[in-house]
Swiss-Prot record:
GO cellular component: cytoplasm
Name recorded for this polypeptide: Histidine--tRNA ligase
Subunit structure: Homodimer.
Gene: hisS
The species this protein was found in: Lactococcus lactis subsp. lactis (strain IL1403)
GO terms of biological process kind: histidyl-tRNA aminoacylation
Molecular function (Gene Ontology), one example: catalytic activity, acting on a protein
Amino acid sequence: MKLQKPKGTADLLPAETAKWQYIEEIARGVFNDYNFKEIRTPMFESYELFSRATGETSDIVTKEMYDFEDKGGRHIALRPEGTASAVRAYIENKLYAPEVVKPVKLWYDAPMFRYERPQSGRLRQFHQFGVECLGVKNPAVDVEIIAMADTLFRQLGITGLKLALNTLGDMESRMAYRQALIDYLTPFENQLSEDSRRRLNENPLRVLDSKEAEDIAIVKNAPAILDYLNEASKAYFEEVKALLEALHIEYTIDPNMVRGLDYYNDTIFEFIVDFDGKDLTVCGGGRYDGLVEYFDGPATPAFGFGLGIERLLMIAQKQEINFIPEETLDVYIAVMGEKANLEATKLAESLREQAFKVERDFSNRKLGAQFKTAEKLGAELIITLGEDEIRTGQIKVKHNQTRKQVETTLKAVHESFAPIFEEIYADEEL
């Protein structure tokens, strides 16, 4: 049997994980600057959590969910998105309690799972940064979180992103728009795709999100939700736009954008980049004020986004952004002979305890081969350890580029390597 990874998944080897670690470090710093705290939730949850949160007519539920019955007869689903799990954790752990400071600001970095046709930027197991801000409704919250995403992109050096903005209004506005959309689409019912015909009376806003060519042509002239906003929804959206402009964050209004999930209201947004002539969404989110209450929690306004890490890496590669910091190694220990094996192990551990990054040879190879390995690993210093060095206690520490070397003792290295390290670099412009 030939063992292979499942379709739609990827192995992240060390050269790739170095990029991921770099991005994660930058993201963690940005989220921390905005006072967001990390949350970790289970990779699988009750199927009902996701089906109710994302909507029974959503593509996630009807086509993409990985779900199964476990050995206890429970209907379980692998996490297709992060917001529902964060909301469940918020309710279950009573983060709505008055003693908890509001807003509750959470972020996560986690794998998600959707059964989709694998293609560039769309895997069946993919990874997202997500942020959720719960407990306060204020246009400034919406804009702060959009600005946080913008800050992350800028710190990573990503360019060419466009911010698309829309509002779905409050419940009153959405209901008025829903009826207008049904009235518009009904005469075209027989021309719509099968999915859109099914959604027409259940959730007509979902037709706007269709990727089918026949649906796109029909909704092109559909009424816009902006024409059905009540005064409160209009005022809220105007303040969001004013705050974005105050921060000099450029945006365009996309009146047909609805996002792919049912729980949104008011502000929604996407960061989009041109990728090989097509629009690629790398980050999207919005306000979801009814979701906590929908799951029997207290009425809780909330706003958040998800950001695809694989897509971020695709864009960076396209823009020739190098996320890999130069790999260096402080010390490489070249080992000569079996008798040096024990001392090399002790020396390596001693140096690591002193906060130096160390590698050693394990294969008892010729010195030339070991020096080549040190070069490949980017080792700055080399210590050669053989029977003579062990017998006399005297060793040489050599710089791998300048060839400058310092003679010292094994005892001195064990006691404190820092002065020796500094002596090697003294008077050198390296």
